[in-house]
């Protein structure tokens, strides 16, 4: 992935941090999120806040065999909520993350009803703490408190969703 390559260029002193950030912005707005291992909140105005306190979640990422056009999803979206996070909050708790939302989900679901069906199927698997869509889609992320539970979910959904890409990860 692009962020990994750019991180390598920083570590080998091929590019400066500023040059790397410029390239990341040109490649895609979310590339900058992967330049280091800190968890981040990406604001709608393009600003990024790094979370110092590590949150312990184990993740199962599920990507269906179709993608979502960012341009199309944003064109469907009419309402954007106000910021839920302020930069003055030093500690982002699990409760804040749990209660957050992605304004683009409803637009993605209108464009791709199968994506909504997939999210409902993931939510109905009660062992996940919650399920979120990444950016403008189409990847869905299941959040778990336990690595073992996440591994079991991965096995289950790899069998059930043979047309989807599924992988295990964790918040680092």
Across the structure, where does each feature detected by a protein language model lie?
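Conserved, helical-rich catalytic subdomain that frames metal- and/or nucleotide-binding sites
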Residues: 41-130, 145-163, 167-172
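DPxDG-like acidic metal-binding loop motif
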Residues: 1-24, 33-35
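Glycine/serine-rich anion-binding loops at beta->alpha junctions
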Residues: 1-10, 130-144
